[in-house]
């Protein structure tokens, strides 16, 4: 399954706020809340499916990519669900987003693909790159790169940067202090249900 490129409002209407996908919010009219299911008993399968979809759309992943991360998380020590979230949070495109350098994860992915981003002074153009503690993230010293990111920073750094990250507004430099804690992941998600959804596939 390919990455979703359709209307984003349609997704957040169904799944709720997904800040990685879009900074838009959906306000229901006259107390409208998913009328197709409000009077029906929702199956456990559907509940798990929707949690999985939240994760996939928020981080902008294909089905194959998400399944790959679930398999890696299952082999790691610790809670599979929390390890899964840590793997996704430490992707380069997500780190750029959480630092406030891009409005959304798709926007961050575009910055990486267009080679605006440096990690430890080396150009990295792979959005899925797995960042590590002590990695230093900067931008290329060219006018276009700085102009794009300055515009984003001025608007989006009003949001609080999570504790595992630091950003120097003077030097345009981000630092990864540590692996993200569960408390710093602001997406409303039940990761256990995602793991349960994939239990038969991994």
Swiss-Prot record:
Keyword rRNA-binding found: yes
Biological process annotations from GO: ribosomal small subunit biogenesis; translation
Domain S4 RNA-binding, residue spans: 90-154
PROSITE patterns: RIBOSOMAL_S4, S4
The keyword Ligase belongs to this UniProt entry's keyword annotation: no
Record InterPro entries: Ribosomal_uS4, Ribosomal_uS4_bac-type, Ribosomal_uS4_CS, Ribosomal_uS4_N, S4_RNA-bd, S4_RNA-bd_sf
GO cellular component, one term: small ribosomal subunit
SUPFAM superfamilies: Alpha-L RNA-binding motif
Keywords in alphabetical order: Chloroplast, Plastid, Ribonucleoprotein, Ribosomal protein, RNA-binding, rRNA-binding
Disulfide cross-links: none
GO molecular function: rRNA binding; structural constituent of ribosome
First-listed, main subcellular location of the protein, grouped into a coarse class: plastid
Source species, domain of life: Eukaryota
Subcellular location: Plastid, Chloroplast
Cross-referenced HAMAP family: Ribosomal_uS4_B
Biological role stated in the UniProt entry: One of the primary rRNA binding proteins, it binds directly to 16S rRNA where it nucleates assembly of the body of the 30S subunit. With S5 and S12 plays an important role in translational accuracy.
UniProt record similarity statement: Belongs to the universal ribosomal protein uS4 family.
Record note on quaternary structure: Part of the 30S ribosomal subunit. Contacts protein S5. The interaction surface between S4 and S5 is involved in control of translational fidelity.
Protein name, entry field: Small ribosomal subunit protein uS4c
Organism lineage string: Eukaryota, Viridiplantae, Streptophyta, Embryophyta, Marchantiophyta
Gene behind this protein: rps4
